[in-house]
């Protein structure tokens, strides 16, 4: 029952949030969509809006405020059109941190931009092991607690029912 609920939630987040969000910043592709969904599954279980414990990470994609700040300072400041597209997803009455925590379209776009700024090509759609390795290297980082095995297992559990 829990897996069925996670599958339903994953399908809704994919259709109502991730797809439209990535399209609005002109960075949609099947592989990007899958990677952003997989990231939400493994980072928050599609459940947590604030990092479990004492950590600073926010939203389904568990982005740290310092990562968001760096994205603007060292990446979007040099790509004003992309920065404007992201800001159009932002809820203006919320702080940047509140947007990360509660604005799903904004959070999905920030996650995608975290991957976009890396020079490596995204793994192909359907390549969960490749996506897991890409997530570990570029998002969770080598020092992060996540593992490729955990990504593959958790994402497979949700997506095998889809």
Go through the PLM ranges and name each one.
Residues 23-31:
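Short, charged helix-capping/linker segments at alpha-helix termini
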Residues 130-144, 155:
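Short, charged interaction patches at domain edges and termini
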Residues 148-162:
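Long, charge-rich low-complexity segments
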């Amino acid at each position: 029952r829990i897996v069925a609920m996670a599958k339903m939630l994953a399908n809704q987040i994919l259709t109502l949030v991730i797809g439209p969000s990535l399209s609005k910043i002109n960075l949609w592709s099947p592989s990007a969509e899958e990677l952003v969904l997989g990231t939400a599954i493994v980072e928050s279980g599609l459940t947590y809006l604030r990092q479990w414990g004492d950590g600073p990470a926010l939203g389904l994609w568990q982005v740290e405020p310092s990562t968001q700040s760096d994205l603007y300072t060292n990446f979007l400041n040099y790509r004003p059109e992309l920065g404007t597209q992201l800001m159009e997803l932002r809820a203006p009455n919320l702080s940047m941190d509140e947007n990360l925590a509660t604005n799903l379209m904004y959070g999905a776009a920030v996650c995608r931009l975290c991957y976009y700024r890396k020079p490596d090509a995204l793994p192909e759609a359907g390549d969960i092991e490749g996506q897991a390795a890409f997530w570990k290297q570029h998002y969770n980082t080598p020092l992060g607690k996540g593992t490729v095995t955990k990504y593959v297992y958790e994402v497979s559990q949700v997506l095998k029912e889809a």
